[in-house]
């Protein structure tokens, strides 16, 4: 897919099976009508997956998943990621964009029951901590926590602090190991079974709503 803004080519993404983000800031015209266009090309290219090997399904063209337009502050969170072990140890990584000098990060972990633990600190990474008494994620009991990270600019002159951006992701506390004997989840060997599911439907192809997927 190739993205154009006001006739200007701003981004090209060489795969139809992965998400991508485009920064339109430099191509936008403030106070005017802007035209955003996406050109999709489904011709076979041996350098772009899944082509280059044998496949047993059709590769349609077009946009068949959600597209959103996000309005951001000049400084914002590009991405957040958490590594969490079954014992409760965790490490949070973040990626920011823009001028973040003087800003702080606030990380909040919340369980499905609503209990939470707060971690505040200057913009130094990674954020490392431990939660006691966590419920490990497993296949039979997929217990998920929610991590929320906020980028905050402290207020000046009596003004309150301002949240510039906020991102959330769900995760589980678990330990996974691939060794010669197989796959081990939280120290227990597990058998992994899967299937190959194609999402092509008669008369609709891939363009089906979430309720049917």
Label for each model-derived stretch:
Residues 1-213:
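Secreted/periplasmic carbohydrate-active enzymes, especially glycoside hydrolases
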């Amino acid at each position: 897919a190739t993205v154009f803004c006001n006739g200007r080519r701003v981004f090209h993404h060489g795969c139809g099976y992965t998400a991508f983000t485009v920064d339109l800031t430099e191509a936008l015209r403030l106070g005017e009508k802007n035209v955003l266009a996406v050109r999709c090309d489904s011709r076979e290219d041996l350098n772009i997956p899944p082509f280059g090997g044998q496949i047993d399904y059709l590769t349609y063209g077009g946009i068949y998943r959600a597209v959103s337009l996000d309005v951001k502050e000049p400084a914002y969170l590009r991405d957040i990621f958490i590594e969490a072990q079954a014992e409760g140890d965790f490490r949070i990584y973040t990626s920011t964009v823009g001028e973040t000098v003087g800003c702080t990060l606030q990380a909040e972990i919340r369980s499905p029951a609503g209990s939470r633990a707060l971690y505040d600190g200057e913009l130094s990474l990674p954020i490392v901590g431990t939660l006691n008494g966590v419920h490990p994620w497993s296949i039979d009991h997929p217990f998920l926590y929610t991590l929320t990270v906020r980028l905050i600019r402290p207020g000046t002159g009596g003004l309150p602090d301002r949240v510039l951006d906020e991102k959330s992701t769900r995760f589980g506390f678990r330990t996974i190991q691939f060794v010669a004997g197989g796959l081990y989840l939280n120290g227990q060997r597990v058998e992994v079974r899967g299937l190959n599911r194609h999402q092509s439907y008669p008369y609709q192809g891939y363009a089906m709503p979430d309720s049917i997927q």
